[in-house]
Amino acid sequence: MKKINKIFLFIIFLFFSTSFFFTKLLAKENINFLSLKNSEVNLRQGPSFEHPVKLIYKKKYLPILILNKSETWRKTKDFENNSGWIHISQLSKKRSALNMKNNSVLYRKPTIYSKPIAKLEVGRLVLIKKCREKWCKITSGNFSGWIKKNYLWGKIN
């Protein structure tokens, strides 16, 4: 009987520990970024074309954080905390980010001991090719290389 209790307790422990892990994993996945599909996109005060335009974005692939959904509209927030609604036809799944650290170094390989390729200014838009634990391979303008993941704001996962 004691052996069955130990097995039962182990199964319960396993269930709760894995559910905790998956809850954390799902919470991470809920941070959802999209990017702007066009070089001119309206940010509206509400989820319809009748609502006034708050802001006009003029940067294709600018990363946008999705806060909420309403049919064909997404409530969004940008890196400057401007929030409003964008129609889904104006959003893309293209992985992009903004560099948030001034003079961050772009490296040839994902290590600080690699050859530096360029320095990126704050606000520089980058397209994400792939990410590892602490690094992302990006392209920006004519440059392609690796940058530290924690310097980026956008869809890095």
Language-model-derived ranges and their functions:
Residues 48-51:
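Second-shell loop/turn segments in exported
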Residues 15-24:
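C-terminal segment of classical bacterial N-terminal signal peptides
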Residues 1-11:
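Bacterial N-terminal signal peptides that target proteins for export
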Residues 13-15, 44:
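Compositionally biased, low-complexity segments
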Residues 25-45, 55-60, 67-109, 115-134, ...:
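SH3-family beta-barrel domains
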